[in-house]
Amino acid sequence: MKTLSPIYLASLYLVLACLFWAGNFIVGKAASIIDIPPISLNFYRWFLAWLVLLPFTCKELLIKKKIILDNIFLFSILGILAVSVFNSALFYSLRHTQVITGVLMISTVPVMIILFSFLLKIEKTNFFQISGVFFSLTGVLFIITKANLNNLLNLSFNKGDIFALIAMFAWSLYSTLLKKRNLIYLQFLYYRSL
């Protein structure tokens, strides 16, 4: 059997990550149409993830029990931000706003990660990151306003947009705090899904 090159595998995983992220928004919107409560959708989604990960992580979790106990506070905060706040706020927002609006707001997460990393002194900010922030925000504003300044001045937010912003802040803070520790990611993902 032919093995896949690391570059090919990395590219494949990046494409799959994008598909899963997009699927999260589509499933969230579909669930809102058939009236599945956001909290229920979030619970069942992560319960299923917990069950799927159990056979792959159980042994390692027992071996790494000390690492988990030493980081229990951080793991709990990360779990609350990523699982509870982000997903519940995102699914709730999709009940009241369009998928494209939610995706556009979430696309500013890298900008917020840079900002949180700077504010929490986790990572120094450089010229390229500042340039990226500028171009990212410009692009998002360009799309949201359809390149019309009047649209920006008359911009109004609905309940869904506010919850999309909450989701964006939660995921940004989660991603920033995740940089603080070198974690065994599969086991952390399992613990986080609890």
Positions of predicted regions on the chain:
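Glycine-/small-residue-enriched transmembrane alpha-helix faces in small-molecule transporters
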Residues: 1-44, 153-180
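Helix-loop interface residues and adjacent transmembrane-helix termini in multi-pass membrane transporters
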Residues: 34-35, 96, 122-124, 182-184
